[in-house]
Amino acid sequence: MSKALLTKAVITLGAIFALQSSPSIASEGQEWIVDNETSHFHFVSVKNNAIGEVSTFETLKGHLSGNGQFALEILLDSVNTGIEIRDQRMKEHLFDSKTNVAFIVNGSFDLEKIKDQKAGESSQHTLEATIQLGSETLDIQAPVTIQTLADDQLRVTSVKPVVIATSSLKLDGGVDKLKSLAGLRSIDRVVPVTFDLYLKPKSE
């Protein structure tokens, strides 16, 4: 066999091996969990029509199953505004975190849409989900980028903020209480939310 033919054969075999060994994202048995250490969830509040403040929830739990069902828990006790007294007021008067443990987000996504993505590749999609707080629910649509990473990991990032009205989850009374306690003229009733979630394969 000539050197050129040998080289071509090696390249062809290598390509076939790479395709055969590439893991399938849309495997029914696959399951991912949210990596809390690297994931982020932020929201912006605006007071007195002029001052915007970025806050976060520091504890996120969630999973994505091989059939595309996903769930995310945003623990309310983990709210971090950068000011401790404000955190406590939000937990007590806005979220009632002793009764309501978390925002719960549920939805589904067709994993077939990303099954051919290789590590480093990404694509944009719209996630349809339901947010629940206590007995209140809100349907949302979230434009996201889904990136396939090494080791079967996924990254799901909001393309633009998801804007949530406080009235949709019956939070207006809590907002009024916070405004009164802080001596503010106003607190905006629409809240932009962004997220950057890393999902890793669930270990057995």
Please annotate each region the language model reported:
Residues 4, 23-26:
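Serine/proline-rich low-complexity intrinsically disordered segments, especially terminal tails, linkers
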Residues 25-204:
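Low-complexity, acidic/polar, glycine-enriched regions of mature
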Residues 16-24:
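C-terminal segment of classical bacterial N-terminal signal peptides
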Residues 1-11:
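Bacterial N-terminal signal peptides that target proteins for export
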